[in-house]
Amino acid sequence: MASLSWWNPAPATAAMAACSPTPTSCKTSNSLALPRSVFVSKQEELMKQAKSLLVKTQQQSKKKKNNSTNSRRTTSIQCLSQEQKWTHEGSITESLPNGMFRVKLDNADVVLGYISGKIRKNFIRLLPGDRVKIEVSRYDSSKGRIIYRLRGGREG
């Protein structure tokens, strides 16, 4: 390895003296010399406080998680969503693209029906002539969601 002529390190004793801490017995104008036990006890105190704060925040977050599911509130929301739908039976008259069908209800109304996720997931095939159960919103009765394919074959 080539020697570095431009690099001249300081003597080891000078570097050690510069890095070594001041002895505890000498007093300077900026700091007080305190025994090591005071620092250790303060450090232990701070660690205990930090741990207690951490435990308190963990307990509070657990309490928040438990309180976030209010059974009375969720049941009222579910009831509202169920109240806003009417269920009708009808037969599919026409197949349209993207899982949509024209459905003629038993009361002679014609509704545009789309397939629900359960029917898509279970790969249930719907063809014109099938009897289906459809869920229609009270606010827009021209569209509905096909929720069930009734057994019993097709109408001819």
Swiss-Prot record:
SUPFAM superfamilies: Nucleic acid-binding proteins. Residues 67-76 have a biased composition (Low complexity). Residues 82-151 form the S1-like domain. It is found in: Plastid, Chloroplast. Gene3D superfamilies: Nucleic acid-binding proteins (2.40.50.140). Keywords: Chloroplast, Initiation factor, Plastid, Protein biosynthesis, Transit peptide. Residues 1-81 form a transit peptide. Its main location: plastid. Residues 51-79 are annotated as: Disordered. InterPro entries: NA-bd_OB-fold (IPR012340), RNA-binding_domain_S1_IF1 (IPR006196), S1_domain (IPR003029), TIF_IF1 (IPR004368). Transmembrane segments: none annotated. The keyword Protein biosynthesis applies. GO terms for cellular component: chloroplast; cytosol. Pfam families: eIF-1a (PF01176). One of its GO terms (molecular function) is translation initiation factor activity. Component of the 30S ribosomal translation pre-initiation complex which assembles on the 30S ribosome in the order IF-2 and IF-3, IF-1 and N-formylmethionyl-tRNA(fMet); mRNA recruitment can occur at any time during PIC assembly. Belongs to the IF-1 family. One of the essential components for the initiation of protein synthesis. Stabilizes the binding of IF-2 and IF-3 on the 30S subunit to which N-formylmethionyl-tRNA(fMet) subsequently binds. Helps modulate mRNA selection, yielding the 30S pre-initiation complex (PIC). Upon addition of the 50S ribosomal subunit IF-1, IF-2 and IF-3 are released leaving the mature 70S translation initiation complex. This is Translation initiation factor IF-1, chloroplastic. It comes from Solanum lycopersicum (Tomato).
